[in-house]
Amino acid sequence: MEVLYSLSKTLKDARDKIVEGTLYSNVSDLIQQFNQMIVTMNGNDFQTGGIGNLPIRNWTFDFGLLGTTLLNLDANYVENARTTIEYFIDFIDNVCMDEMAREAQRNGVAPQSEALGKLAGIKFKRINFDNSSEYIENWNLQNRRQRTGFVFHKPNIFPYSASFTLNRSQPMHDNLMGTMWLNAGSEIQVAGFDYSCAINAPANIQQFEHIVQLRRALTTATITLLPDAERFSFPRVINSADGATTWFFNPVILRPNNVEVEFLLNGQIINTYQARFGTIIARNFDTIRSLFQLMRPPNMTPAVNALFPQAQPFQHHATVGLTLRIESAVCESVLADANETLLANVTAVRQEYAIPVGPVFPPGMNWTELITNYSPSREDNLQRVFTVASIRSMLIK
């Protein structure tokens, strides 16, 4: 993997800097590095493809070295270099696609394609000019089964989940009380509702709770917490739990009371926030527990009082909600990130070349299914294909 990264970094620099008119002295170190790459690769043959619709291609390396010059690089010099650069880039592109198309149940972090396996050989260790990539560093740690640390802007840690729980129900569905939620990506929205606006609840207060368990622990998370759940702020028709009928939800939004959010790790509370909104920090957690209340307003204007009558029918439904959004966090496991294109790149290649479903990844790289059943095998394979995708993105836009 280090060799693949070094090749890509060298080729990217060469493509950007070996241009007509450039002083040779400004790129002499790069050209020496480029020539070292050619010397190491010359005389070797590789094969890529042969999976799905990814065509088999054979690669032979027999290129001349770039010479020295006292002055500026002329058109002939650059044209000669371009021919070599374009062939190498095409090779790297195909190695990356070949690697992204493959998976393995055991040791999925190791190279799976024939070409990348060959590049891992001892004879190519001289191509190791730059090992500064964050993904390469983490791939090395994962490969040695040591602690890794990935900084994500918006980690897609929550599998998609949208449902409701009724704490009070009737066959007519005309006096309900319960919670509904939508968890997806890096955001949780949860709402508590009571058609009767807590008229018969103790002290006219309804208590709600929402617990979300993460598939992997997060650390040093920056989180936005808001006293509202906008996705549950408009009328809708909802299918009943048994699918036999539908019921009408017509929310009127109240501000939640006594909001408390707990961040737990292995069942132990690490951070707790009470009635605090905006930006909060969670140190280390694998579970989020939200507690909040719906309180019937003790004093109401006639207009508000008309919304919440003392008895049925209840045409407007008192609702309170929370939004919790993870803006950034560190995770020891590789995850898709809303601000990165790695998952999209891998999925696109696998779809374009009709890669058959293997033993590890779900059909279509379905992220909800993948993260819901996030096994060590999937983690290893994701680490590898995301690393390859990050390398490919240097050259292929």
Curated annotation (Swiss-Prot):
Gene3D superfamilies: 2.60.120.170, Viral capsid alpha domain. InterPro entries: Capsid_hemagglutn, Rotavirus_A/C_VP6, Virus_capsid_a-hlx_vir. SUPFAM superfamilies: A virus capsid protein alpha-helical domain, Viral protein domain. Keywords: Calcium, Capsid protein, Intermediate capsid protein, Metal-binding, Ubl conjugation, Virion, Zinc. The N-terminus is blocked. Residues 62-73 are annotated as: Interaction with the inner capsid protein VP2. Zn(2+) binds at residue 153. Ca(2+) binds at residues 266, 286. GO terms for cellular component: viral envelope; viral intermediate capsid. The keyword Metal-binding applies. GO terms for molecular function: host cell surface receptor binding; metal ion binding; structural molecule activity. GO terms for biological process: fusion of virus membrane with host plasma membrane. It is found in: Virion. It comes from the Viruses. Intermediate capsid protein that self assembles to form an icosahedral capsid with a T=13 symmetry, which consists of 230 trimers of VP6, with channels at each of its five-fold vertices. This capsid constitutes the middle concentric layer of the viral mature particle. The innermost VP2 capsid and the intermediate VP6 capsid remain intact following cell entry to protect the dsRNA from degradation and to prevent unfavorable antiviral responses in the host cell during all the replication cycle of the virus. Belongs to the rotavirus VP6 family. Homotrimer. Interacts with the inner capsid protein VP2. Interacts with the outer capsid glycoprotein VP7. Interacts with the outer capsid protein VP5*. The VP6 trimer contains a zinc ion located at the center of the molecule. The zinc ion is not essential for either trimerization or transcription activity of the DLP. Zinc-depleted VP6 has an increased sensitivity to proteases. This is Intermediate capsid protein VP6.
